[in-house]
Amino acid sequence: MAGKGGLRILLTGASGLVGQGVALACQRSPQVGHLAALVRRPGSLSGAGRELVVADFLHVQGRSDEQAGFDACFYCAGAPPVGTAEAEYRRVTRDITLAVARAWATANPEGGFLYVSGAGADPQSRLMPLRIKGETEVALQALPMRSVMLRPGGVRPVSGTGTRHGLLKPLYWGGAPLMKLAGAVAPSLMTSNLALGQALIALAGEEHPPGTVECADINRIASGARDPAS
């Protein structure tokens, strides 16, 4: 829950497609009083906010004191499921996420850890990305902290944000009209990175948020939280 100065948010993955939209939502939201980003390199956070530079997130535990005093961690970092080998995908998606989460649980046992997972995440899935995300969800839920798993389907970039991955840029550029249409007619399959940020902020402000939030509910929560003037 927010203090008098608004929510204090720690963000990971600020330079990625999801994180860019989430950062923008935080910077625009009157509910957010302070935004900091856990980054590997300076300059990863665009716009207002403070950066906490940690070169290797696997060793963030030694600096857990820097994570103290936040209301929620929005964990948006990850590897693209396309073109990433399984060992690397597991290292980034599970191992690094859990390293940050353990440090977070030490520094903020009452704070919320909101993890951007994916639709269909299941530790028993035959699809490698969904299986590893499912394993990560189970491990996060076992830690001594409040956690929320958000499971977006497709995520489209809006408001000038985009992917850094060269292989995916043509897909997002060419598929933008179809993705926008899908978001309108099939909210259970598609959301935007800005809507994801709006939903994260709304959930962080709840005293008892749900443990798992599917794509349609992400859009519903974002719609209810959105400023009509924005």
Predicted regions and their residues:
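N-terminal Rossmann NAD(P)H-binding glycine-rich loop of SDR-like oxidoreductase domains
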Residues: 2-29
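NAD(P)H-binding glycine-rich loop region in Rossmannoid oxidoreductase-like domains
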Residues: 9, 50-99, 103-106
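Short, polar loop motifs at secondary-structure junctions
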Residues: 37-44
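SDR active-site strand-loop-helix element
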Residues: 12, 38, 76, 113-119, ...
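Oxidoreductase cofactor-interface core, primarily capturing Rossmann-like NAD(P)-dependent enzymes
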Residues: 123-225
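Conserved Rossmann-fold NAD(P)-dependent oxidoreductase catalytic core, especially the SDR/UDP-sugar
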Residues: 79, 87, 95-137, 142, ...
